[in-house]
Every structure is written in structure tokens, then in C-alpha cells.
């Protein structure tokens, strides 16, 4: 009976709470599992506490059809150590190696995401490698997706003998190889997924970037024969300016492009990606995942720190349930839900946005590099202009994203 009430309430929430409706293109799938939830309740003699009051030991094992991963809280656990460090894993970019770059506090590495409805299993590197045996895993997207890729590599590499692993880095494509498992964990740089004039040689001024929102073939030819594809695209669209968008010939893109609002251009680009997936991917061979947007934290007033400077000096997650700042654009989330909801090929949504929204403490801040050089002392003393509140320290939040990803595998 409790199961039925919960399922009914969940349906009402889906109808009336916009934030939840567009977080997953497969949200309605959880209602098909109501019978399974009821069966579980019956097996435990109906002794279920309300979700908000459940003790950890009574929680269900993680089941994506039942558990809403976006609802939960961060719990501090000093006894749980990260599976790697930026001093040990040799594959991390200096940009995200916060401790090596002088970050003095370490608590940000000891927060664990605890969903309300279930227990999220810890990342098991042996299980991950068994899942990948004889397969290719490819992360596609921007620097935040590269962070998730590096996190995954570092989470598994420590249990692989040195002579059984290798890394080949490139400007566009990088490949980590686990020889013993005949597996690769790869990254492909495509910040917009669709083609742009800023793909290979990055154009810092967004006013000079031009997107070919109807073209993806140049990138997509590198995504074939892959067993697991994990996509993301968000932050590069959010410059605050209109997007220079082009159809047809790209030869003289400086002439004839149209300036579109970011959500409009994003929808066109994501539809191009979705059409490629639907027309190309064999779902019997390849599983497709989409990581939702990674929040930025630029306005401390949004988490009631009136004297703060961006995310600088933040040392704890936001406690307010449902905190949602301006760094996560709900219009973009709605586009993702709309487009993925109409696709023929099933795409598993890695819904990381809400849980990441709380983590104002976990960005690289001033403990990072820019232009290939570490910030100077003078730059560190000016966090208003130099604190990076977009990227995440590693170990850190992207490790939780990969916990969720592995749970889906």
C-alpha cells in the first residue's frame, strides 16, 4: 500500500514539478517498477518507514527504475578515503590537481552522496574492469567530461600492473588501455558535440565562435564501434551571448550565420546529435549515456553567503534541500528532456546536476592553472577574477558521477 502511495505521489510530482520532469527522459519508467517495489515491501512484511525517515540499513539496493538519484544529501565521512589522489594517479591534468596545486583543505574529498530512497554502492574498480572486459568506453564532450573520464581512469588504474596499462594523449582523442582486460577508456573532445570553428584551435572570445548546428559527421566518425558512449555538452553554450549558428556550407561562416538564443541553438545541436544516435547506433551492441549539466557557482548570494567571493573559501556543501542556482539553466535541462524523450534509441541519463549543485566547496578555485601555467600568488590573491568555479578538483565530485555510471552498468 505504501508503495502505491509513493508511486502516486511521484506521478503528481512529475506533473507539477518542472525540475524533476526534465531531469530524465525515462522518468516514467520508474512507475513500471511500482509492482516490483510493492513486492519488495511485501517480502519485508510491509515494515517500510517513510523515505525521509529511513535508516541507511533499511534502504533498498540501488535500482535505477526505483531510486531517484537526484534526491538525497551529502554526508561527511572522514573514514572513507578516496580510491586515488592527485599525487598518485599519473593521468590527471594539473588543472584539476588541487592538492598538488596547494589547496590547503581536504574535507571536500570526504563527502559521500546519500540518496533518500536507496544505497549507492561504492565504486568497485574490479567490477568496473570486469564490465569493460573486451570493450570500449568513450566519453565525449568538453573539459568537464574530460574530468569525468580522468576520474574513471584514476578509479581503476591503481589495480592494474604497470606493464598492463598505457595512456596515449592527444589534442582531440586520448586512450587509456587496460591490456589485461583488452579494454579501453577513451575521451574525445567535442565541446558542442556538433561541429564548430573552435573545436581544434580554441577561440576564447565566444563572439567569434561559429557553430554548424546541423553537422556532426566530422566528430561522429570517431564514435563508431564503441560499446559504451557517455556524452555531455553544456557550459560552452552558456557564455551569456547569442550563439552564432550556421546551416549548410561552412566555408565562409563569418558571413550568413544567424545569432540564436542559447536554448534555441542548443536544441538544434542536440537534435542533430539525437538524429545521429537514432540513425547509427545499434542498441543491441552499444549503450548510450548522457551526463546532465555540471553546475557553476559564481554568485554566493544564492547560497546565502553575502560576503563570499564566487566559490572561493567555501569549505562545505550547501545544506538547503533543492538548492538550485543560476549556474544551472533549467531551459537547457528542459531541452534535454524534450529531445531525449523523443529518441528511438534508449539513452540512460546520468542525472548529476542536483547533487552537484550543493558542492560549492569542491571546485578548483585558485588551485588550478590557466593557459598551461599555475596561477601566480598575485592571481591567487584576486579570486574575484581568477577563481575557477566551473571545474572540479579530483578526487572529487566527478567520482560520484562515476559511482552512478557504474551502478547503471
Q: What are these model-predicted stretches?
A:
Residues 1-409:
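A compositional signature for long Ser/Thr(±Pro)-rich, low-complexity
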Amino acid at each position: 500500500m505504501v508503495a502505491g502511495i509513493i508511486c502516486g505521489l511521484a506521478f503528481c510530482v512529475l506533473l507539477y514539478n518542472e525540475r524533476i520532469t526534465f531531469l530524465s527522459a525515462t522518468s516514467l519508467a520508474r512507475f513500471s517498477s511500482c509492482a516490483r517495489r510493492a513486492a519488495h515491501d511485501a517480502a519485508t512484511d510491509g515494515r517500510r518507514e517513510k523515505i525521509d525517515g529511513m535508516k541507511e540499513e533499511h534502504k533498498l539496493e540501488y535500482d535505477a527504475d526505483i531510486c531517484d538519484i537526484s534526491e538525497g544529501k551529502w554526508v561527511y565521512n572522514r573514514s572513507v578515503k578516496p580510491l586515488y589522489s592527485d599525487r598518485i594517479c599519473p593521468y590527471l591534468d594539473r588543472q584539476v590537481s588541487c592538492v598538488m596545486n596547494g589547496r590547503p583543505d581536504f574535507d571536500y574529498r570526504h563527502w559521500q552522496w546519500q540518496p533518500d530512497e536507496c544505497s549507492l554502492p561504492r565504486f568497485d574498480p574490479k567490477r568496473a574492469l570486469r564490465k569493460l572486459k573486451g570493450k570500449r568506453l568513450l566519453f565525449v564532450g568538453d573539459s568537464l567530461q574530460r574530468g569525468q573520464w580522468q576520474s574513471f581512469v584514476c578509479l581503476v588504474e591503481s589495480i592494474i600492473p604497470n606493464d598492463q596499462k598505457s595512456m596515449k594523449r592527444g589534442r582531440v582523442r586520448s586512450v587509456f588501455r587496460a591490456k589485461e582486460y583488452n579494454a579501453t577508456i577513451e575521451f574525445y573532445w567535442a565541446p558542442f558535440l556538433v561541429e564548430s570553428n573552435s573545436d581544434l584551435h580554441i577561440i576564447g572570445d565566444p563572439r567569434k565562435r561559429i557553430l554548424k548546428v546541423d553537422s556532426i559527421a566530422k566528430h561522429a566518425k570517431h564514435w563508431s564501434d564503441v560499446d559504451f558512449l557517455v556524452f555531455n555538452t553544456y557550459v560552452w553554450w552558456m557564455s551569456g551571448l547569442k550563439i552564432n549558428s550556421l546551416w549548410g556550407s561552412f566555408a565562409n561562416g563569418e558571413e550568413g550565420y544567424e545569432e540564436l538564443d542559447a536554448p534555441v541553438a542548443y536544441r538544434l545541436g542536440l537534435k542533430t546529435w539525437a538524429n545521429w544516435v537514432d540513425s547509427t547506433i545499434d542498441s543491441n551492441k552499444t549503450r548510450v549515456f548522457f551526463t546532465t549539466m555540471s553546475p557553476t557557482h559564481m554568485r554566493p548570494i544564492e547560497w546565502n553567503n553575502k560576503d563570499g567571493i564566487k566559490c572561493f573559501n567555501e569549505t562545505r556543501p550547501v545544506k538547503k534541500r533543492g538548492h538550485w542556482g543560476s549556474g544551472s539553466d533549467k531551459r537547457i535541462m528542459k531541452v534535454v528532456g524534450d529531445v531525449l524523450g523523443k529518441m528511438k534509441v534508449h539513452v540512460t541519463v546520468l542525472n548529476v546536476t542536483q547533487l552537484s549543485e550543493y558542492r560549492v566547496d569542491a571546485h578548483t578555485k585558485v588551485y588550478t592553472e590557466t593557459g598551461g601555467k599555475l596561477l601566480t600568488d598575485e592571481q591567487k590573491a584576486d579570486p574575484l577574477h581568477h577563481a575557477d568555479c566551473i571545474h572540479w578538483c579530483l578526487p572529487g565530485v566527478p567520482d560520484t558521477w562515476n559511482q552512478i555510471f557504474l551502478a547503471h552498468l
